[in-house]
């Protein structure tokens, strides 16, 4: 099975999975204040979601930042997120921590063995190594459930809406994906999907920071995708960006529920590059064909 087909299968597997996902017991507010979630790539986005949904009681961190400040590792409860469980920086953090829990698909991994506890992510997949989809939504919702109570409803409706919205996007030479509090981490994840699946020049930023910085690298014909519900401020942004010749999209989740919005924007982030890959008769994800880049990455992170 080629990686684009595997990705599509994994995306579809999320629908039944999310209807029966097993969530974690909520940490007390006291314990949350001494908790750090740590990860890299998609897993850092999951950690940032936990931080946002906890109202910043917990902190999200990059593993190398923690290794440069080992007192943070020793004085807090650390949750290390890694689907493979073999990323070397996370394993190093685990070895310095007193109270450390792995959140991983691979409960036999180096990370799981280095941690005192393990939350095993149990989800179905195509069995082919492809761009992360169901693994991200599983780890993200697992992390959020440790800091906030929620229920998941209307998955099929969210999927249909995300599928519809994904086909409206016109991709320019450069893509800017912007969001705020609960959606900025998904913007990060979304940019990663455009990198991994299409090899697209994509950027993620908080909405306010984009207006201060990223906007000045935008050119007419570039694409801006706003991950936030409609409001007066965003309407003004859209009006001004369109005057610059930018393609501006604001996918509509159709709900004000924050968890539902995260799921919607996650699905949208998977379906949009998948749609373009299939449209261009692409069989493999970009990260598979870009062997030199993949080898350089793997050489450093494993």
Feature names for model-found ranges:
Residues 27, 31-156, 160-166, 180, ...:
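Glycine-rich phosphate-binding loops that contact phosphosugars or nucleotide phosphates
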Residues 4-5, 246-302:
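Phosphate-moiety recognition in structured ligand-binding domains
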Residues 4, 45-49, 189, 266:
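Conserved phosphate/anionic-ligand binding catalytic regions in large, soluble enzymes, centered on
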Residues 192, 238, 274:
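Short glycine-/small-residue-rich flexible loop motifs, especially phosphate/cofactor-binding loops
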Residues 2-3, 7-33, 122-223, 232, ...:
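Active-site phosphate/pyrophosphate-binding segments
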């Amino acid at each position: 099975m080629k990686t684009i087909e595997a990705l599509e299968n994994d995306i579809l597997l999320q629908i039944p999975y999310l209807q029966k996902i097993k969530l974690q017991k909520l940490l007390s507010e006291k314990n949350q204040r001494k908790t750090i979630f740590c990860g890299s790539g998609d897993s850092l986005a999951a950690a940032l979601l936990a931080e946002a949904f906890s109202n910043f009681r917990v902190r999200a961190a990059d593993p190398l930042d923690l290794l440069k400040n080992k007192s943070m590792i020793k004085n807090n409860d650390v949750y290390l997120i890694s689907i493979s469980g073999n990323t070397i920086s996370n394993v190093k953090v685990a070895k310095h921590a007193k109270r450390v829990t792995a959140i991983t698909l691979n409960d036999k991994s180096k990370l799981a063995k280095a941690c005192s506890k393990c939350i095993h992510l149990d989800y179905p997949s195509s069995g082919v190594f492809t761009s992360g989809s169901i693994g991200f939504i599983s780890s993200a919702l697992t992390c959020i459930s440790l800091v906030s109570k929620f229920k998941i409803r209307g998955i099929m409706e969210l999927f249909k809406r995300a599928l519809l919205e994904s086909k409206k996007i016109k991709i320019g030479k450069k893509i800017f994906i912007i969001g705020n509090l609960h959606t900025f981490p998904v913007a990060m994840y979304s940019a990663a999907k455009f990198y991994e699946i299409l090899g697209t020049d994509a950027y993620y930023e908080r909405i306010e920071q984009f207006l201060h910085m990223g906007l000045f690298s935008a050119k007419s014909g570039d694409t801006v995708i706003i991950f936030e519900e409609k409001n007066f401020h965003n309407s003004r942004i859209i009006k001004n960006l369109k005057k610059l010749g930018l393609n501006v999209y604001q996918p509509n989740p159709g709900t004000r529920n924050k968890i539902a919005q995260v799921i919607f924007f996650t699905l949208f982030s998977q379906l949009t590059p998948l749609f373009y890959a299939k449209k261009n008769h692409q069989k493999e994800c970009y990260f598979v064909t870009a062997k030199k880049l993949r080898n350089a990455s793997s050489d450093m992170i494993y």
